[in-house]
Design a protein with these regions (language model features):
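Extended, subdomain-level signal for the structured scaffold at the beginning of enzyme domains
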Residues: 29-30, 34-172, 184-195, 205-216, ...
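Intrinsically disordered, low-complexity basic segments at termini and long loops, enriched
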Residues: 1-36
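Alpha/beta-hydrolase-fold catalytic nucleophile elbow
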Residues: 406
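Short, thiol/selenol-centered motifs that function as redox-active sites or metal-ligating centers
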Residues: 179-183, 384-387
């Protein structure tokens, strides 16, 4: 049967047309009128991507703006992008932005504002930057994009070198962006949203300066400024940046293979067969394998969401080192090497996808033996993207099971009867399709382990619904 993981919220729309701003009663801030007012010149984003049952195909990326950046949109040359990070940065927002912009061909520099390249992002995720912000001061960029998270946003705000760089960039007409807390905490504090329409994380809306028109759109574009709400809107945000840099055709091209959600902000579902109760005697213990070449977004989304739900997640590297380089060159630091992590017992073992990451998993005898032991014990296991086909199917771990995988890998599955579903649960197995389904995959796991209300709570907290 088809089981709705999250209910539909009628008030949330893919197209959010906002009316003319009006003053609040106390005169402290301009806010936009209700979404129902259709006669608006407001620039905002509509990103409906639809999955074709046979081949992933993205619908058109529609972006309206108060003013265009035609020079940036028309140039085919590689664009240079700076993404600063700090301790406490929201990892989904940082990594999703970097991943998608690199898919578009941008030269993205992840720069630490800390003293070291390694930053301890939120939810226990450890990232390694490409350089220090202090070493980027003489460089010019086509885009500077600020991830959110706290205290990461406050640290970005307090970095004098970064402030000088961004202000100079904006004064020179550069494209700039921020998501989550960063529009209010960083750009607002620096006076870079004055007179503009902007959005941010819901609990920070009141922290936007009075001279900013606060919008509740998932992604807001006003001239050269692009803002967004949170981790659950990060993919939409990043694709808006691709369109601003390279144009609509490139944004559509990048979106197609990612298996995007049909309607952003609304319900999602999983196909569940042979329903089984997923329960743990204590806090669920989850093993997430990583290797060089795993898919950046998938890996980070799974870890982040499950830790938000209060599961204990161990990130284990099957490589000889803790640090791995993901498929889009994000550098992540695992919690343990495989040999140490494998000494523990787990309720659930998960594999992100990506290439050559899935191939590395498939060739790891120690990982395959652990998975087979897990399956034989009737414990829970799962995989996303290329891994269901390249790892689980290849090693007999889908025998008698219904599953899905990345659409280009469907033909490798012996049973393709459920492949069109974005998330499939069959007893103790869960599989999913790709980067654009990873949030749904993680939230489906949250519901199976913790219940529907917890899944709703986590989904709302990241502005996924």
């Amino acid at each position: 049967k088809t089981h709705d993981v999250l209910p539909q919220f009628e008030s949330q729309r893919d197209i959010n047309i906002v009316g003319t701003p009006h003053p609040r009663r106390d005169g402290s801030r301009r806010r936009a009128a209700a979404p129902e007012m259709a006669n608006s010149t407001l620039a905002l984003l509509h990103l409906p991507f639809f999955l074709n049952p046979i081949r992933p195909r993205a619908a058109a990326l529609h972006l309206r703006r108060r003013s265009t950046i035609s020079a940036m949109a028309s140039s085919p040359l590689q664009k240079k992008v700076l993404v600063p990070v700090a301790n406490g940065t929201e990892p989904m927002e940082a990594v999703t932005t970097v991943d998608i912009l690199r898919r578009a061909g941008a030269d993205v520099t992840v720069a630490s504002v800390e003293e070291n390249l390694r930053v301890d992002a939120s939810w226990g995720l450890k990232l390694v930057a490409d350089s220090l912000v202090s070493d980027c001061g003489g460089d010019s960029f086509d885009l500077i994009s600020l991830p959110g998270g706290m205290p990461g946003s406050a640290t970005l705000r307090d970095c004098a070198i970064l402030e000088e760089m961004v202000k100079k960039h904006v004064s020179n007409g550069g494209l700039y962006a921020a998501i989550c807390a960063a529009p209010a905490v960083v750009l607002g504090s620096w006076g870079l949203l004055k007179g503009l329409r902007a959005t941010c994380y819901p609990s920070f809306m009141e922290k936007l300066p009075p001279d900013v028109t606060a919008e509740e759109s998932r992604v807001q574009v006003d001239g050269r400024a692009v803002t967004s709400r949170g981790a659950g809107t990060a993919m939409e945000f990043a694709l808006a940046l691709v369109e601003q840099l390279y144009g609509k055709d490139k944004a559509d091209e990048v979106a197609k293979p990612m298996v995007m959600r049909p309607r952003h902000g609304e319900e999602f579902s999983m196909e569940e067969l042979n329903s089984a109760e997923w329960k743990s005697n204590n806090i669920p213990q989850i093993f997430v394998a990583v290797a060089n070449g795993v898919e950046d977004m998938e890996t980070v989304m799974i870890i982040d969401i499950l830790r938000r739900a209060k599961a204990t997640v161990v990130v284990a590297s099957i490589e000889d080192e803790l640090e791995i380089v993901a498929s889009k060159k994000t550098k992540l630091v695992a919690d343990m090497l495989f040999e140490e992590a494998a000494k523990l017992e787990y309720d659930l073992i998960l594999l992100p996808g990506g290439l050559p990451g899935a191939q590395n998993f498939a060739e790891s005898e120690k990982l395959i033996n652990l998975l087979k032991k897990q399956a034989e014990s009737k414990k829970f296991y799962g995989a996303v993207c290329a891994s269901p086909a390249m790892v689980l199917e290849r090693h007999g771990l889908l025998k008698g099971k219904k599953a899905t995988a990345y659409p280009a890998r469907w033909s490798a599955l012996s049973d393709q009867s459920e492949v069109q579903n974005r998330v499939v649960v069959d007893g103790n197995l869960i599989t999913s399709q790709g980067p654009g389904t990873s949030m749904e995959f993680a939230l489906a796991i949250v519901e199976k382990l913790f219940g529907r209300e917890k899944a709703l709570e986590v989904a709302k907290s990241v502005v996924f619904i």
